[in-house]
Amino acid sequence: MSNPTEPKGGPLPGLLRPPIVFLAAILSGIALNRAWSLQFMPSTFGLLGPLVSLCAVLLFLLSLREFRAAGTSVRGSERTTAIVRTGPYRFSRNPIYLSFILLVLGLSVWLNDFWLLVTLVPAVGFLAAVVIPREERFLERNFHDQYSSYKASVRRWL
């Protein structure tokens, strides 16, 4: 029987999901670049873009693997059953969000698209001001000392 005091879902029910926010940032940046192209670096630097993007994908996949190994869901709308402290979570409390940021940075360099950097700013602002504080309140409420200890020992970003 479930405990009626426990929340029914994860920390983000009804909230615009971060993957959608970052997809919107990418699509907006590309659309703006098509309308008003703003290149910001020599084209030779574009070779770094695929490398940064690949690092982003690897970080995302490693983070997902740790969630699966801990037996908890990565989806913000589903119940969180464990605090993940292994893999990339040893260094950052938000490696999935870091992977989203790295992906947009990598695409920006790869495509030499300044607008992607511009649209990244509100996406990161939304994470920092709305999503992460809400997630942290949820985790503190549901995992008390376990999350407080983790929060004290691992930085939010890097």
Locate the predicted segments by residue.
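Membrane-anchoring alpha-helices and their flanking helix-loop junctions
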Residues: 1-86, 98-158
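Solvent-exposed interhelical
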Residues: 89
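Extended, alpha-helix-rich binding/interface surfaces that flank or overlap catalytic cores
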Residues: 94
